[in-house]
Amino acid sequence: MQARLNRLTDAPVGVVGAGRLGGALAAALRAEGIPVEGPMGRGEVPAGCQAILLCVPDSETEAAAQTVAGAAPFVGHVSGATPLAALEPATRRGAEGFGLHPLQTFAPAPASVELAGAGCAVAGSSPAALALARELALVLGMEPFEIDDDGRAAYHAAASMASNFLLALEAAAERVAGAAGLDEEEARALLAPLVRTTVENWIALGPERALTGPVARGDEQTVRAQRAAVEAAAPDLLPVFDSLLSETRSLAGRRVPA
């Protein structure tokens, strides 16, 4: 028999995992008038909850599901890459499983995390579980979209490329800027407006139309000078430069003349 979905205000949502994501989700739910138990430490079991959210590292999801098995009719995880099968210890005890992955970064920054307007990947082992995941996302101001288990790895890889790899690229740019006499803080402050505008142009125009710079202009002399500068300043970054140069040339080749 499938679990019945009650109104979110009828019973608490339990949050297991007191890290950045668990704390942020617990605070955001409370701010929307949803009763919350937690965030609790790993190994603790919220009582009297309609749903329990496991905000733990991916590798600990199955163990956490085992710990809370039988404690709530709905048990969910907040991992982008982990399949719902990881919740099997809880679903074997009668719970419905769901996934709720905010497509947002939760860095240890002083600014509060902005969930409103962010995408949220949802999944459910039953219509009721999927409905709960959607409702939680909407209550928090996010835009829910379905990702099935087969698509999770590709979805999460895209998220990592757009967020984590972007930081690796900016760190590389800071290093190369050092050869121009700029320290890391100076480089970050000076490059930040360029990065923001580039991302905003990508959002508004798409990658092909947003592309500017020497590759887009076909200025090979400048590209050669840039490559030589990278080789001199940080030779270990040359494979990164060459790989990105190749991708940028492919992107430029797809541009439609204005």
What is each residue range found by the language model?
Residues 9-12, 72, 117:
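Phosphate-coordination loops involved in phosphoryl transfer and adenosine-cofactor binding
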Residues 25, 32, 112-204:
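Internal alpha-helical scaffold of NAD(P)-dependent oxidoreductase catalytic cores
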Residues 2, 7, 189-258:
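NAD(P)-dependent Rossmann-like dehydrogenase/reductase catalytic/cofactor-binding core
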